[in-house]
Every structure is written in structure tokens, then in C-alpha cells.
Amino acid sequence: MKKFKLVELIKEAIIKKKGIKLSEYMKMCMTHPDYGYYTKKKPIGFKGDFITSPEISQMFGELIGLWVVKVWMDHNKPSEFSLVELGPGNGTLMADILRSTRKIAEFHKSLKITLIEISPSLQELQKKILKNYSITWKKKLNNLPNIPTTIIANEFFDALPIEQYIFKKSKWMEVIVSLKNSNSKESNEFCFGLKNIPKPLEELSTFTNEENKIYEISPGIKETIIYLSKHLNKNFGACLIIDYGKEDNLGSTLQSVRNHKYSNPLENQGESDLTSLVNFKAIKNCATKSNLVVTDLVDQGDFLSSLGIQERFVALSKNMDKEKVALHISSLKRLIDKNQMGKLFKVMGIRNKNSLPLEGLENK
């Protein structure tokens, strides 16, 4: 029933506006307060629709934890240090970060932890797994403590709604979501359409104007990076971004995943995870305009290897039986193998220009 209610709400918006932006459609599907995907589902894990690196192996979070400690040390071990995670999922990554660094008492004492999470069900999970820690939860990224800060964004930006534009017949048009049979009030089938835009967006001026090519823009990426840039410029620190994406924005990358399988993004509203490949070039352009240092993209496998994942693998294997070792090997391969997440997922760092180079991302 909830699924059909969401379909009706989307349909009403389409009829009222004669088609809606793709970003509006995605936002309704994903974060509608009553019927959205993140509002009512627990999507992450083997029983969910997708799985993230922290759920695959504890090694991922442990190494990120050591990376954060290095940033803290590089800022002369401040007595107050803000650790922020955007879209913390089940809370596994933050739990592993805090567990693996618990012996560094001075670091733990300095921490002011903030989790940015829009999903009530995921907040509930996070509060259970992180019940022993003092943490502030926010639905929006704002009013962070004005102290040195590290921001972690693992598979966050791919979930932000996107807009699509196409250069057709020498003019820009926007991709919208419409009703398949607009003449029928009973139609609940959606389709993509095109709409003239009166004035091209500023971002479109940077594109190459290739005929019939789709370009993607994420308003949420721009908004997030502008806020983080202002914060890091004022307070020092760094941001670590890990996501699947590419260095440009040419072609449609919208995808829908349900039960670990790809599905039609215009079906199963509120039941499927809608994402897109992250445009790292857009992130870099936005951050460099704010006078921040942005690292080159590094494959996840290379990044984790530089932090010592193989050594950590060996240390953990010593206390495992054969069955657990086999699973451990499989997890390692999934994280770093070039045919799996090792190459598909990219890592980018952003830092204050007066902060030290970032471990695993910049040549010293």
C-alpha cells in the first residue's frame, strides 16, 4: 500500500508541474518522510539491497581509523577534534574506527563525533551499535564545532539526487520524469522526457556541448562541498571521500538496485536504491575554487594497500581456523582486487592548504 501511495504522490507532482526534475523524483523515492527508501528500510548488508566496504571486513574501518589518527597527530594532537561521518549506514565504519583506536586515550578524549543521517531506521541502528559513545546526530550538515575536523564520506555522494541535461539540436534540454500515457488518469507508468530550459545553468558552460550526450549535475554535491570547504578553511583538517565514480560527467549513470540486482529506476519506487556514479571532477572543481588542496584519485585497493591492509590481514589470520581464513581471504580480495571493489571504488582527499599531506593519497 505504501508503495502505491508514493506512486500517487509522484504522479500528482508530475501532473501539476507537467513533468518533474530527475532530482525531485529521486528525492521523493529515497527520502520521502513516510514512504521513502531510506525512511522505512534497512538497506545495507547481506539481507539488504547492497553491501558496503565496512560490512565486508573490519580491516576497512580499522585502517580508516588509523588514517584519522594520523590527521589528528599531524594537527599537533588538538585537545578537541571533530570527527564527522556523512551517511554512516549501519554505523559499522564508525564503530570499527573507534574500536581500533581505543588504546590511544588522548585521541579518544579529544573527539567530538557528529553523524549526519537522514534515515530514522539507520539512526536507530547506529545508536545501538554506538551506544557506548557520546555522539551528536544531525539530519543536515550544518553547525559543526569550530575545531580541527576530519570528515569521512564513504558511499555518501553516490546517493545524492542528480539532474541530467542533454545538448540536442544546438540547445540544452533537461531530462525529466513524466507519465508514460499523459492522456490517461489511470496511468501509473513513468518515463523519461525532455524539457526546454530558459537559461542554461552556470555548470553547463564547462561542458563540451556534444550533440545527444547526457551530462549530470548534483546540486547536493555542490552544496556539501561548499559547506565543507568553508569549514576546513576556517578550522583546518581534512575530508576523506570513498565512492564509486569517475573523473567526468559524460553519459547517464543513474542506476537502481534491489536485492543486490539492477532494476528499472522508474519502477519499485521507495523499494529500490537509486544512485549514480560520483563525478569527482565536480567535487575537485568546487573544492579548489575554495583554495583547498584536492588529491588525485586513487583506487581503493591501492589506498588500502598503502595503509597496510595486507599486514593487517596476516595479523588477523593467525588466530583463525581454515574456514574463517578462507572467508578472510575472500573479503580482502573483494576490497582490493582490481576486478572487484579495488578499482571500481575511488578515494579522494581534501584538506586545508596549511595541513600536512594526507597519508596514502599524496607523495611526501
Residue ranges of each PLM-predicted region?
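A residue-level signal for conserved active-site and pocket-lining positions in enzyme catalytic cores
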Residues: 29, 151, 283
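Short glycine-enriched loops at secondary-structure junctions
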Residues: 30-35, 197, 243-247
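Conserved RecA-like P-loop NTPase ATPase core
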Residues: 60, 151, 243
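A short SAM/SAH-binding and catalytic strip from SAM-dependent methyltransferases
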Residues: 139-141, 146-169, 215-223, 227, ...
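A mobile, often basic/glycine-rich helix-loop segment
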Residues: 150-206, 254-264
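Long, Lys/Arg- and hydrophobic-enriched amphipathic alpha-helices
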Residues: 200-364
